[in-house]
């Protein structure tokens, strides 16, 4: 019953964030009337922010005022992710990385590998293929530069780093702090707020998995359904801005026709997101005897209805419309 109620609350929060109006009354299966509780028809109620901030007194016969939830405006829907279920964690991470799009994921994966395996180029060169991969590298992922991997393999590699490699390292929290800092400094996260929020949730998961003293069984994270919708709106908004810029440029060209001057275009300097030289640790942060069979990622699911609606309905092909 409680699981069903959590799903209902999350769905209503998502609808509220999208501007829907609703008033929902719930009567529990074993709703009992006691002397301490007024004789109400329903045990709980949920009201959207757009209907009314303060429920009127006419609600009193229907539900106890203390059991009325009024959703705030612009509330960020959240989900509770169980930390003792690796498949659900893997699914959330996989979907989060997919929402980032693949150009950013290529840069992030290369940066992470430089930090967790500082001397990889000399000890585990890509030129040796699968025979030269480190112990922590997923067995079912080819040993290639992240740029050259298939999308599914690249996302699987990133999930492995968060779920397996970092928690197994003797310097997990120190390395995680370094990963968090250098990732946040990448240009992509300065331009797009939604992607920054997505990575914040990814690192929250990593922090819980790396912290041996963390006793909670669940963690509250932003609902990827809502973030996907916001990213879709942001993408269409920026595409509209680009179209306006093109129109302005055409107008300027028409105005300047017949003159010697022409509008100049200032091209931004290309910033490298992968040129980073990690600090050395007293010993290799990734243990040599790391067993890849532990928590091996298998049977990846692209999305889970608890977390994300089908991405094909929200965006077009990842391969054709990657953007930074």
From Swiss-Prot:
Residues 270-286 have a biased composition (Basic and acidic residues). Residues 253-269 have a biased composition (Low complexity). Residues 253-288 are annotated as: Disordered. It comes from the Eukaryota. One of its GO terms (cellular component) is mitochondrion. InterPro entries: AFUB_07903/YDR124W-like_hel (IPR047092), AFUB_079030/YDR124W-like (IPR021264), YDR124W_N (IPR048462). Present with 3510 molecules/cell in log phase SD medium. This is Uncharacterized protein YDR124W.
